[in-house]
Amino acid sequence: MFLKSELLECNGSSVTLFQLSALQRIEHLEYLKQLEAVEVGDFQAAITFTVKSGAYLVAMSLWHGHPLKGSQGENAAAEVAKIQDEVMQTWPTELVAEAEYKVKLLSGMIAPVIDEPTSSGEERNEPAEPVTAGKALASELKFAMKLAREFGRPDWRAMLAGMSSTEYGDWKIFYQDNYFHDAQLDAHFSGLLYTISTLFFADPELTPDSFSILSPAPEAIDIDDPDDDTLMAKAAGISGGVRYGPDGSR
């Protein structure tokens, strides 16, 4: 069976991603069903599953051209599991997220993003002030943290839906025009949410229940709890700080 493929490049190295077979897509759905077994409120388990599921999808794609293919006889699942471990241990999360997105595109699991041309008579709403990477990142972190606090498995599309029109406009203009291609946005937000998630289980004393925005437990309210600005600073540090555009500007 012919499978489509695409190169994924990072820091001068490249790997070939392959389209998933029909059987692999079914296996992926079965793997995702494991999420239902994660106990409600078990934030760390849910986030760990999110990261592992992305690595699993990438591993199934890499398997078609990987040296491990056929090494376990008929046990392809064991081969994929070894590749998954390799991906989780050696790939940065943003690269895993980008690869996951590309594999889903190759496999027809998601539709490609298509920009609608702007008509000549249509005016484009510009922000009142210049949009910087720091400002856009602040909007991302604010809503990513809110989603991370309230739900075990944040959804970046829901995060965007929670933005005000001004915040969304700032985010869209900066990332669409200055840094990312549209096709990279899913990968970018997956990586960002991994970053936010890391913030909550990196410190044993910092849990979503302690900082619930919608329904904080009375015993969890403490004047010493860090505010959003502090959490955002920590998250920015985890993700490597402020992002830069292709021209080096903030």
From Swiss-Prot:
Interacts (via C-terminus) with tail tube protein. Interacts (via N-terminus) with the tail assembly protein G and the tape measure protein. Promotes tail assembly by creating a scaffold for the tail tube proteins. Tail assembly proteins G and GT probably wrap the linear tape measure protein to create a tail assembly scaffold. This allows the polymerization of the tail tube protein, during which G and GT are released, therefore they are absent in the mature virion. The tail assembly protein GT is produced by a rare -1 ribosomal frameshift. The ratio of translated G/GT is about 20, and this ratio is important for proper tail assembly. It is found in: Host cytoplasm. Belongs to the lambda-like tail assembly protein family. The keyword Isomerase does not apply. Pfam families: Phage_TAC_2, Phage_tail_T. InterPro entries: Phage_tail_T, Tail_assembly_G, Tail_assembly_GT. This is Tail assembly protein GT. Its main location: host cell. HAMAP family: GT_LAMBD. GO terms for biological process: viral tail assembly; viral translational frameshifting. The keyword Membrane does not apply. Keywords: Host cytoplasm, Late protein, Viral release from host cell, Viral tail assembly. The gene is gene 15. One of its GO terms (cellular component) is host cell cytoplasm.
